[in-house]
Amino acid sequence: MNRKTGTTTVGIRVKDGVILAADTQASLDHMVETLNIRKIIPITDRIAITTAGSVGDVQMIARILEAEARYYQFTWGRPMTTRAMANLLSNILNENKWFPYLVQIIIGGYVDEPTIANLDPLGGLIFDDYTATGSGTPFAIAILEEGYRKNLGIEKAKELAIKAVKAAGARDVYTGSKKIQVVTITKDGMKEEFVTL
């Protein structure tokens, strides 16, 4: 079975926090399944992941990470950092490389510091200031490269993330162009909102 799906998710790290954004359309081949799917999944109150790929695989990964985060908190009395969770996820994905999870994930959070990482299905891990996943990546990255500055404030970073997903939605048929899910993570916690275009 060779069916095309797609999405666009982005992550941006600035000094005051992390922005994750994603379209809310789920597609299969030429059909739109729904316009209201959440592609950003909270793992803790300070860490979330974005989804590009198999829904079932990413749901399984989210359950594993939630359990590991609770176990870490219980064992050590402090929350797992985003960097530690990204490394754990990299190991999980690499362990399964012969029967891989069909996902590309952005993990973002603010535990000790704002952190963004991109993981491929085989566990390849890249920490960066901004990243994108999914079929709309070329369009989103072009916007991020043009607009990103290390001194961006959290509100400007949110505007840039929305602009990147919106640009992908205008050019990539598998990326939704009607609504964007946005999650902001700062030292004060996590906030989710939806932007209608």
Swiss-Prot record:
CDD domains: proteasome_beta_archeal. The formation of the proteasomal ATPase PAN-20S proteasome complex, via the docking of the C-termini of PAN into the intersubunit pockets in the alpha-rings, triggers opening of the gate for substrate entry. Interconversion between the open-gate and close-gate conformations leads to a dynamic regulation of the 20S proteasome proteolysis activity. The active site is at 7 (nucleophile). The keyword Protease applies. Pfam families: Proteasome (PF00227). It catalyses: Cleavage of peptide bonds with very broad specificity. Keywords: Autocatalytic cleavage, Cytoplasm, Hydrolase, Protease, Proteasome, Threonine protease, Zymogen. The keyword Thylakoid does not apply. The 20S proteasome core is composed of 14 alpha and 14 beta subunits that assemble into four stacked heptameric rings, resulting in a barrel-shaped structure. The two inner rings, each composed of seven catalytic beta subunits, are sandwiched by two outer rings, each composed of seven alpha subunits. The catalytic chamber with the active sites is on the inside of the barrel. Has a gated structure, the ends of the cylinder being occluded by the N-termini of the alpha-subunits. Is capped at one or both ends by the proteasome regulatory ATPase, PAN. NCBIfam families: arc_protsome_B (TIGR03634). Component of the proteasome core, a large protease complex with broad specificity involved in protein degradation. This is Proteasome subunit beta 1. The gene is psmB1.
